[in-house]
Amino acid sequence: MAEAVPTDEQLGTAVLAALGRVIDPEIRRPVTELDMIRGVDVQPGGAVRVDLQLTIVGCPAADTIERDVRVAAGSVPGVAAVEVDVSVMDPATRAALTERLRAGRPKGIQFTADSLTRVIAVTSGKGGVGKSTVTVNLAVALARRGLRVGVVDVDVHGFSVPGLMGLTDEHGVAPRPTRVDSMILPPVAHDVKVVSIGMFVDDVSTAVSWRGPMLHRTVNQFLTDVFFGDLDVLLLDLPPGTGDVAISVGQLLPHAEVLVVTTPQAAAADVAERSGIVARQTGQRVIGVVENMAGLVQPDGSVLHLFGEGGGAETAARLSRGQDTPVPVLGSVPLSVPLREGGDAGVPVVLGAPEDPSAVALTAIADRITTMGRGLAGRKLGLSLS
């Protein structure tokens, strides 16, 4: 018995359903949900014309979206040919889209105390302790667990996250995020949404020499204008020390939790304690210490402690003084060639060499963070005495 030929209406409905599986690579939502599909026209003989509207002129994802639309429509049984007419949203349609993406919320910081997103600021006292490397690996490890993760690189003067996440080209230049009106769409790498001041400079050697007010405005804009969507975890890679950016993050996100990165060296531990103390002064909770560069495993199985021992435990002990709940050492990350190579290549070690001891340690730290209870500072508990 011959298979029934679908009617034009049935074919159009099937094509529209297939297009619902096409995801905008920047907004990370179906193109049908974003009103990017303005119509599906079924013509004689199974030819289909799809009216596709992009968000802006020069959309960097245009070729990808058009290809995915063509493939999705062509995969529907009964479709003989696919034509895609590409246009651009008018200002009114684009404004309606940005309003819908914001879910009707007024423009402002997305990550308030009552949001469902867990905000973790990764800080250190000294530079060069591997804070950014720890941040990106934790982000990717959490994303591999199925969480929706974003990273904000607020180390404005020493940005490195785009390179560590593989977002830079052969010249070290990161892609400039797409703007939809006042909304900034963060690039995605390894299933993590990322934004950094390094995406707004034209040359990797450009020195960003801003003072307090500009730094505060930058942090505020990243937290206000960048569309991250619904995240489970947002990690902030802070600059080392206790300067303007740390203070701004404390003011803008007083409910954020803080993760302190140090090395086993006593000098690093001394300074790391200060970064935790400053975080507490703004109401933030220190959830733990990560000891990086903990040792180098030798061929005979012995460990060479290039930076000494005990810095992580000492930092945690100092930050625990006078606290009801002790600050734990969440883990120690050993020195590792694959860890360094992964950073240089833009493939974090938890993804590129998951069996390496450093990757195992970082993944365990990420898992431990997910099992820790989120702080209630600043959150409404929804209790009623009536």
Please tell me what each predicted stretch does:
Residues 33-36, 41-44, 55, 62-124, ...:
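Extreme N-terminal, non-catalytic leader segments
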Residues 58-60, 201-214, 260, 264-267:
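Flexible beta-alpha connector loops of hexameric P-loop NTPases
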Residues 142-205, 209, 216, 223:
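Phosphate-binding loop that captures ATP/GTP phosphates
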Residues 195, 238, 364:
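Glycine-rich phosphate-binding loops of nucleotide-dependent enzymes
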Residues 69, 221, 225-228, 232-332, ...:
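Conserved catalytic-core segment of NTP-binding enzymes
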Residues 2-38:
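N-proximal, solvent-exposed amphipathic alpha-helical segments enriched in charged/polar residues
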Residues 345-356:
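C-terminal boundary of histidine-terminating zinc-finger modules
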Residues 118-156, 276:
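Walker A/P-loop phosphate-binding motif and the immediately C-terminal alpha-helix
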